[in-house]
Amino acid sequence: MVMLGQVVALAMASSAVALNCKNHNVLSNYNVANKDILLKNELDTPPSKTSEMWYLAPCEDGSRRQRPSECSSDDLMCAIRHVKVDGSDHLTQKLDVHKSAKYEVEEVESGGFDIRFLGVKWGSNTIDATLSYSCDTNLKTDELVTTIWNSEYVLIEMSGPSGCKRDGNSDSGDNGNGNGNGNDPDNNNNTGKDKKSKKTSWFTWLFVYAILFTVIYLMVVSYLNTKGGSFQDFRNEFVERGTEFITSLPTFVKEVVTKTLGTRDSSASRGGYSAV
């Protein structure tokens, strides 16, 4: 019974900690999936020089190509601090966040997201470690912005492509709403195009129907006038009436436009006055 309880507990732990970014409801929208990052920072701490190295591979299903030899293969995050003084190099601090760590993921309103590892053991201390990603489309690789490392918590702020939403979800491409309209969250651009397309389609069909009805009318009239005659008679009648219609069409259109504009001008000239 005790062994069964241990097996169940182990299964629950492993299912709770697997951070598969490609299938995560938040991280799958960002460029962090399948990436590992190696960041370095040097501080002038007289009389010594302090160098920090941060290895970040928060996605368990991601790459481990940049992992330094000091970090474990199952690390989701690894921090190493060296101090150089009097020509000698000393490893003073090391933090490992293994894939067994619990985590929280939260999107940031200003853009990007945070991954927070909870209850990480660091010697006798239990701390939280936060990876904060922000988007910068001008950068090709992620750059370190701020680091805080003390006995209570660790904070690493980065800026670069990992904090940007993927193509089809990015703010620059679809505002994160997945409709591919960039800075047009209400789909106004597509709406305008749809309206224009509908107007064009409506006019095209109106023109087609007008031509169709005209041809039918000419055929009916030509048939009635040549009823009992030969096909050649019908053809000659149809061609003659069609030619007359085409030649008279400009005059007809001009007359309609003149009458329409004349009516409007007449109405406008009497605007504001009433009959006495």
Curated annotation (Swiss-Prot):
Residues 162-196 are annotated as: Disordered. Belongs to the ATG27 family. The chain crosses the membrane at residues 201-221. It is a single-pass type I membrane protein; Single-pass membrane protein. This is Autophagy-related protein 27. Glycans are attached at residue 189. It comes from the Eukaryota. Residues 19-166 form the MRH domain. Effector of VPS34 phosphatidylinositol 3-phosphate kinase signaling. Regulates the cytoplasm to vacuole transport (Cvt) vesicle formation. Plays a role in ATG protein retrieval from the pre-autophagosomal structure (PAS) and is especially required for autophagy-dependent cycling of ATG9. One of its GO terms (molecular function) is phosphatidylinositol-3-phosphate binding. Residues 182-191 have a biased composition (Low complexity). Disulfide bonds join 21-59, 71-78, 135-164. It is found in: Cytoplasmic vesicle membrane; Golgi apparatus membrane; Mitochondrion membrane; Preautophagosomal structure membrane. The keyword Transmembrane applies. GO terms for cellular component: clathrin-coated vesicle; cytoplasmic vesicle membrane; Golgi membrane; mitochondrial membrane; phagophore assembly site membrane; trans-Golgi network; vacuolar membrane. Residues 19-200 are lumenal. It comes from Candida glabrata (strain ATCC 2001 / BCRC 20586 / JCM 3761 / NBRC 0622 / NRRL Y-65 / CBS 138) (Yeast). Residues 1-18 form the signal peptide. Keywords: Autophagy, Cytoplasmic vesicle, Disulfide bond, Glycoprotein, Golgi apparatus, Membrane, Mitochondrion, Protein transport, Signal, Transmembrane, Transmembrane helix, Transport.
